[in-house]
Amino acid sequence: MKVVLQRSKAASVTVDGTVTGAIDSGYVLLVGITHEDTQEDVAYLAKKVANLRLWEDADGKMNHSILEQGGAILSVSQFTLYGDAKKGNRPSFTSAARPEVAEPLWEAFNQALREHGLHVETGIFGAMMDVALINDGPVTILLESK
């Protein structure tokens, strides 16, 4: 499982002209799921996202988590994180989990974040989405469960 985490000042996701999720300060999470991912991967990355210290303290040191900062999450499923472009010019997505496997794990990940006390907004699984965000920093971290 991979998560591209971007700290943001504001973000939203729109599907067919309708905003399906929006946050003020927090994280935008682009979430990719592969064939081998399990509930253990979900739990590991949800805990990591909740506790990662990416917010500055009074001394300017990244020392506060999103829980301490009071931010929210915008979670967007993104199978293209498992795109392989080593051969040729068209990426292969065979490492991405099939939708019937990926969607329940993405939903479980979002629920695990909520269980950590985070407010979670989402896109729509499998939809073409317009994601807008104002990067904060920018701070962008790639998290992987394996």
Swiss-Prot record:
Q: What InterPro entries does the record point to? A: Daa-tRNA_deacyls_DTD (IPR003732), DTD-like_sf (IPR023509)
State any single GO MF term.
tRNA binding
Q: Which domain of life is it from?
A: Bacteria
Which Pfam families does the annotation name?
A: Tyr_Deacylase (PF02580)
**Cellular compartments annotated:** Cytoplasm
User: Quaternary structure per UniProt?
Assistant: Homodimer.
- HAMAP family xrefs: Deacylase_Dtd
Keywords from the UniProt entry: Cytoplasm, Hydrolase, RNA-binding, tRNA-binding
What is the protein's major site of localization? cytoplasm
According to its UniProt entry, the function of this protein is described as: An aminoacyl-tRNA editing enzyme that deacylates mischarged D-aminoacyl-tRNAs. Also deacylates mischarged glycyl-tRNA(Ala), protecting cells against glycine mischarging by AlaRS. Acts via tRNA-based rather than protein-based catalysis; rejects L-amino acids rather than detecting D-amino acids in the active site. By recycling D-aminoacyl-tRNA to D-amino acids and free tRNA molecules, this enzyme counteracts the toxicity associated with the formation of D-aminoacyl-tRNA entities in vivo and helps enforce protein L-homochirality.
- Which CDD domains is this protein grouped with? Dtyr_deacylase (cd00563)
EC number(s) from the headed UniProt entry: 3.1.1.96
Gene Ontology cellular component terms for the protein in this record:
cytoplasm
Tell me which Gene Ontology terms the entry assigns under biological process.
Answer: D-amino acid catabolic process
Q: What is known of its domains?
A: A Gly-cisPro motif from one monomer fits into the active site of the other monomer to allow specific chiral rejection of L-amino acids.
* Catalytic activity field: glycyl-tRNA(Ala) + H2O = tRNA(Ala) + glycine + H(+); a D-aminoacyl-tRNA + H2O = a tRNA + a D-alpha-amino acid + H(+)
Give the protein family.
Answer: Belongs to the DTD family.
**Motif Gly-cisPro motif, important for rejection of L-amino acids location, chain numbering:** 137-138
What protein name applies here? D-aminoacyl-tRNA deacylase
